[in-house]
């Protein structure tokens, strides 16, 4: 059986005074992890993993809709199919 695996990284620009709250909210999303946050610049690097592109897109939209987020930029995306091939 094949499974699909998707991963992307995002640069999130946010209001600097809200970085801590935003990081907490993003880390609560399934498959979402704040890898780096820099309060003075208001930037976060976020890694998102999902089993399909629809879930990945929904998570990116959820990140975009968090209060205090100003912009979300996709900087990397990889998709792989995993599993055994059967004749």
UniProtKB/Swiss-Prot annotation:
* Keywords, comma-separated and alphabetical: Chaperone, Cytoplasm
How is the quaternary structure described?
Monomer in solution. Interacts with the cytoplasmic NapA precursor.
Species of origin: Escherichia coli (strain K12)
List the Gene3D superfamilies hit by this protein, alphabetically. 3.30.70.920
Q: Which family does it belong to?
A: Belongs to the NapD family.
Q: Which GO terms describe its cellular component?
A: cytoplasm
Q: Name one GO biological process term.
A: negative regulation of protein transport
> From the Swiss-Prot or TrEMBL record, what is one GO molecular function term?
signal sequence binding
**Annotated function:** Chaperone for NapA, the catalytic subunit of the periplasmic nitrate reductase. It binds directly and specifically to the twin-arginine signal peptide of NapA, preventing premature interaction with the Tat translocase and premature export. May have a role in the insertion of the NapA molybdenum cofactor.
Where in the cell? Cytoplasm
- State where it is primarily located: cytoplasm
Spell out the Pfam families in the cross-references. Answer: NapD
Phenotype on disruption:
Deletion mutant lacks periplasmic nitrate reductase activity, with either glycerol or formate as the electron donor.
Which HAMAP family does the record match to this protein? NapD
Q: What is this protein called?
A: Chaperone NapD
Q: Does the keyword Cytoplasm apply?
A: yes
